[in-house]
Amino acid sequence: CLVGSEMCIRDRLYTDSVELIHYARNVIVKHVNIVQIMTYYSLGRWIVETQQMGQKRAKYGSKVIKILSEKLQEEFGKGFSEDTLKNARKFYLTYKERISETVFSLFAIEKSETVFSLFEKEPPFIVSWSHYLQLMRIENEDERSFYEIESAKSGWAVRTLQRQYNSSLYERLALSRDKNGVLRLAKEGNVIEKPEDIIKQPTVLEFLGMEEKAKYSETDLETALINKLQKFLLELGKGYLFEARQKRFTYDEENFYVDLVFYNRLLRCYVLIDLKVDKLTHQDIGQMQMYVNYYDRYEKLEDENPTIGILLCKEKNDALVEITLPQDANIYASEYKLYL
């Protein structure tokens, strides 16, 4: 073909792609996830470079993908549809800063297995291709980074990632943080170091399947949460261990009952949760303060941290909460929502 012609450029793209896919299939058994992702990254880069030919805007447009897809499917089957190649292109454009020229050359050009030792020391991609298909839909870079890190650290399945994104986990955590705290979310995920790190505004309980306008009691809500305990633990966040429901304690010959008692192994403290299906009152806050005081004085060990109290309520008045509680109180109020 005539060097520099459109046909020659497309043929080169196809030839390079075939060689790369054959290479990837040979090494994929050992390094299945990173090989798959790097293959799509490399295809995406070549597609962009072929379309643009060094220009800022694409010169040849979508027909490059259409022609390449047809040829690759003849060679390898249905795994390289137009949609797949479009996703590869989008993936490269989204994450192109992740891969250095040296690493790209070792993988896609030289096809050297020494590149995998670099990946083991510092993996450029930390979740599966299916996760990245979801992550690429997130426009905000900091938010996208947060969900990627949390997916890897918490072992989220793709379905869990979708649920956490749909419930606006990033925004709910960000609401209780300052600017530096929000930046840290994007770089490190949700690091649990202090009581404020476990609070979400609001707490989303859509998995209970309860109607928003239906009349229900605190016992109904509590029962629904226990029946869906695994999903409730996911919504609460990291480090939670369930201890008891309606935990009774006796003080001065009077019995009291805490709705839900958890232990957070990351914060090394008890977490008491009281459920309120109406607007939060100062009496509710005072009651939780008494529960927390009791646990701090009679239940927690010397080397454990102070007890945390969380009031899950239908509605709250932030000014009322602030004026009722002392500044150093380990008690938090969070509204719950029964729908996303």
Feature map (PLM): residue ranges:
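Basic, low-complexity intrinsically disordered segments
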Residues: 5-6, 10-340
